[in-house]
Regions:
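Core catalytic lobe of class I
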Residues: 1-151
């Protein structure tokens, strides 16, 4: 059994270069998660299970003042280099499908990406949080759950 809760997309910066979770698009995040899943599958027993706890985010709620690494597609926080660097923000630009204030759907995008890569999507479990972290939003309800996927 493997149980993990990877860094959620665009929600935390742990201060490590090349860290997972600071990809410039949801698609790049899912692509990297699928690559991680391939490595997990390689070391998991044939009858083993993979439990994935993952939360969501909203388009437009990403980091500001970051630089896009053109080679890796990752966001680099706290860049102290040239002021000519392209200033980008995760979830603040335009997207073909996702609009400002849309829930990005990272949990399901991730689960379906892993399924497309050969994992069996066995179950989705709602982790209900009776005392969630308060949010300062006025146009939607406070998020009070995360997903756990059994793969």
């Amino acid at each position: 059994m493997i149980c993990t809760s990877p860094p959620y997309w665009a929600l935390r910066d742990y201060g490590a270069e090349g860290q997972f979770g600071l990809e410039s698009t949801p698609e790049l995040y899912v692509e990297k998660l699928v690559q991680i899943g391939q490595e997990l599958k390689r070391v998991l027993k044939d009858d083993g299970t993979f439990w994935l706890n993952i939360g969501d985010t909203y388009w437009g709620g990403g980091w500001r003042g970051s630089e896009l690494n053109e080679n890796s597609g990752e966001i680099q926080k706290g860049h102290k280099g040239s002021h000519d660097a392209e200033d980008i923000s995760m979830g603040r630009g335009s997207h073909d499908i996702i609009k400002p204030k849309d829930m990005v759907g990272i949990p399901w995008r991730s689960a379906l990406g892993l399924q497309a890569d050969g994992w069996y999507l066995r179950q989705d479990i709602i982790w209900n949080k009776p005392n969630p972290m308060p949010e300062s939003v006025t146009d939607r309800c406070t998020k009070a759950h995360e997903y756990i996927f059994l793969l």
